Amino acid sequence: MKALLRNLAVVLFSTLLLTALVSAEEIAVIETKFGKIEIQFFEDKAPVHVKNFKDLANKGFYDGTIFHRVIPGFMIQGGDPNTKGDDRSTHGMGGPGYSIKAEFNDTPHKRGILSMARSQDPDSAGSQFFVVVKDSGFLDGQYTAFGKVLTGMAVADQIVNSPRDRRDNPNKRIEMKVKVINR
């Protein structure tokens, strides 16, 4: 009887462990001087954008970049490698050296949505992303939403309210470090 109970316990423990491993979800953690923003991905709605963001984060691409555009009542934007340098005139113009095709979906651009920045060309997204701090329905169907903030909107609010210049670039650098972890 003891052997049966022990075997049953081992099977139950193994099943629970396997279930936990299989159901582990990858999230992004954006670390700033104000705290952390945790992001859940929409892999079912924008798989290419999610993979691109994760790949860039895992390579350290975002580390040392800044939030270079902050507009109160709208969004915070980052992910430009040009922001690692001191020439503020180039902020907002950089990318990874390639573009990805838009994956517009039915996700509304409500507070906390993570979306991909782009130029006039819908298929010009690369590395720059933004977090919406106020519902912005005018973006729906025009920008690829690929995640949402799980925790850390208070951090995003601090970032968006930072003093900024006429180009909406914060006066003081708000650097980020981005990592992808299992949750």
Residue ranges and their predicted role:
Residues 1-7:
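Positively charged n-region of N-terminal signal peptides that target proteins for export
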Residues 7, 12-183:
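Cyclophilin-like peptidyl-prolyl cis-trans isomerases
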